[in-house]
Amino acid sequence: RDWLLLIGGSTYKFTLTGFYLVALVAILKNHGYSLNQLSWIHLIGGIEAAKVLFAALMERRPAGRFGRFRGWLLAATLGLSAVFGLMACTDITQNFPLLLACCVLLSAMSAVYGCAMLGLSCIVLPHRERGFGGVIQTMAARGGKMIGGALVLWLYQEYGQTAAAGFMLAFSLLMLLQLLCYREPDSPTAQGSWTALAARLVSFWWRPETGWRWLVLLFAVAA
């Protein structure tokens, strides 16, 4: 059940990415949106950069009745389901302010979902299995981007905007059902202040097995 949730959750996360960055932009372009308007969509997508803050908040929040990360996953999936439900019932392409509001929610909830799923994978997978877990997540990322980008666009081309949004809604509800049936294992609450967290982040790159050269490599790959 743990592996099933990690595979499904990782696929869903990158399906959201493919939908937002590929399908949604292509659909809006087809509706006559200008490059200036589309730039706002990508700018709002920068909310994902706040993941570091979301992750720190999740680590320090005591586990509640839904678990440390499962509660965040449930809340994010509910929010995403509401947005996709609105998209399926309303033509938001004709209302730019409403579209921007939906994009803010999509980006924010997607960031929360991604952080919570990564945190859950860290407490579910033993240290020796995290390498294999990374491979699974990479494969799920490839598949998710194809689903969110290519498949959703095909549905839009063949059956219209309602069908494309309806597919994303159905996928969200399926993940919500999976989360409702899942029970998160116990995990300790992270200790230390925000200052200690910043110190750990800096010291991590001074370790022999990491080092600043790997940080430079990461930035080079990202660029």
Model-derived segments and their meaning:
Residues 73-93:
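C-terminal ends and interior cores of transmembrane alpha-helices
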Residues 56-62, 87-88, 146-164:
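Transmembrane alpha-helix termini and helix-breaking/packing motifs in multi-pass membrane transporters
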